[in-house]
Amino acid sequence: MDFITELDIAFQKIASKESATPMENYMKNKFSFLGIKTEPRRTVFKKLYEKHKSEIKANFRNMIWELLNKTEREFHYVALDLSIKEFKKNYLQEDINLIEKLITTNSWWDTVDAFAKYLVGGYLHQFPKETYVVIEHFSNSKNMWLNRTAILFQLSYKEKTNFDLLKAECEKHKHSNEFFIQKAIGWALRDYSRFNPDGVSNYVTSTNLKPLSKREAIRNLHKNL
């Protein structure tokens, strides 16, 4: 029995309709849920990962894509966990095409933000010369989730964040009326403010950001503004 088939069977055994309803409501009824919470889901994944490690190592890209296209959200979370685990420092240059598909398939903040931080951030850390090409493509896309990714992908970069690039993305999207874009701008700036508070403070005070973006950006800087 292959990994995904066994995962499906294991999930059906622990599914809970009672838990599924509030989980679906929390996600604005965007997706169907089996009602499996994080800890038991990851316990099943860990057990089956060890059992099917050879199969997964040989075919994880196809598995991730198959999982993300299943109906229930729990499978999408497994796709996310599997992608982070297997891609780590192991990217091929052409993987950016799959990563873009992952971001734009069954998209919502709970998967996109992790794909942005871990997959896009990790990929561009491994292939830094691709940064401007990839981010320009994402930033100019009509897909809002790719735009959000272009803003958030440096969340794990800490003091190595390219602040000029972050500011350029904020400038490009600062007039957006989309909640998820305004929130991303504030989040990215707030995160970087831990390492460059003066730079973020100066940028926020000199830039006409949307109120939500500004509130999020200065949450840890309000004493200085």
Give residue ranges: language-model regions.
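Alpha-helical scaffold domains
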Residues: M1-L225
